[in-house]
């Protein structure tokens, strides 16, 4: 060995090899850790904090601080999570918030409770549910479907992902209601492990948006989900002549992206580097426009949430860009309000730098669709109106609310009543004493939040 090191030729070759390894290592570090680990972008908005009611709060605003328990573990559960909600009988005097959730983390029996008074009180657990719902394997999502002829259906979707100990994922399950959620079909599986196109879905469908054809509404809906390799899929829902649901073969939609100059590009690599998932899809112009926006969770937390747009009903998408810090988070759920603004709930992710972060818990952004579009198009610091901390999620050892909060929350059901009330259902450790993770809801109106924000902006605190 000593003779080798005395050999100048060997030393030169060894030095060159080590230099090459160092350069390669630094290049890989840049490619996978620095290039895809960005500094946080976009300023922060002021936050209206509804976790603690200040002294002197006007009586008509006190309700904003009232968190309603939906299910504290009525069946003895210590952990309940991942609700979703749909509004029944919208625009009538009998509006009902229908909330479905799971008795466990992701997997477990599905439960349902309803509220007929805008989230002030909730029913007991409904008992006339499909037998197959007792063995749900993942987060449920529920949507109302409106048809061209005026007919309505409701659809509930629950994925079958590859949990630890499972050999594979097993597609996604679907139930349909045609009677205002009074009854449901049993689960029907699509794209399971024994199908021609086996899939391993997670959070199916994180979004389900109605599509247009030639500018007019069609009886088609685009559903989005991801798998355990962070491949992002779309599948198109239609119904046959007998009213049975059909889903098109899933396809990776970010392969069909286009740069600002019109050049085709594949955004799947960037999506995988960020571990983009749980994508929400929002239609412009109060849900009536011809543009779609997607925004999703950057699971590495080394980039902000990512956004893109489509003007051809999801056939192609613009390049992915980071969203502003004001909406950085996980499992975004967006709805329009009667005044044309948008509310978006999510699990807060506050990035302190390239590699560190904390959460402020359960957050709702208030702004306009156009605010986020301006940010995307020009980098203009268009961040929206303000944020709302809906409730405090307690970290271990916390005895009172603070800025930093638990991150095991979000996955909200969000409905907007005809009078403008917004009912948000979520899950979390909402008290310091019980140690339980349970389902709760908060009801707010933007006109009342605006009053609190005006006071906040005036005092600067």
What are these regions (language model features)?
Residues 15-16, 26, 285:
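Compositionally biased, intrinsically disordered low-complexity segments
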